[in-house]
Amino acid sequence: VTTGKLATSSVTSVKVGTEFTTANALTAAATIDVDYTAAQVFTLTPNANTTLNITNAVIGVSKVIVVTGAGGTNTVGFTVGGSAGTFNRISGTYDDTAAAKNFIQITCVGATEFWYTISQIAT
């Protein structure tokens, strides 16, 4: 590239990393690693209170975690690299009603700081 710029439409989804174009089903457990470099969308149906431990976070990158309620009173929380970190909830609450879909969008804004929202399908 002689102009120092990419040509219009030269970067397509085929050319970006899998961390931006794939989904990853997480396995239910008390603590689950969510590797920021593994996928763009993560899915989970928890079977107990669950801590989602963010690993390999990249500042400025957002991820989606779709958590399907298990029909109990389970909760979902966050850590980063096994430590507390700062998780700023913008809006919404987790709903563990059976089959309820919780759309969690989380953005890394610092090495250990994240902002997130939780939404459900409108009724």
Model-based region annotation:
Residues 1-29:
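Fibrous stalk/shaft segments of extracellular and virion attachment machinery
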Residues 9, 25-31, 60-62, 101-102:
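Glycine-centered loop/turn motifs
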Residues 21, 35-37, 97-98, 115:
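Intrinsically disordered, low-complexity regions of eukaryotic proteins
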Residues 26, 30-34, 52, 76:
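Generic detection of short hydrophobic beta-strand segments and adjacent strand-loop junctions
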Residues 29-45:
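N-terminal beta-hairpin/loop module of FHA
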Residues 44-123:
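Acidic, glycine/polar-enriched metal-coordinating patches/loops
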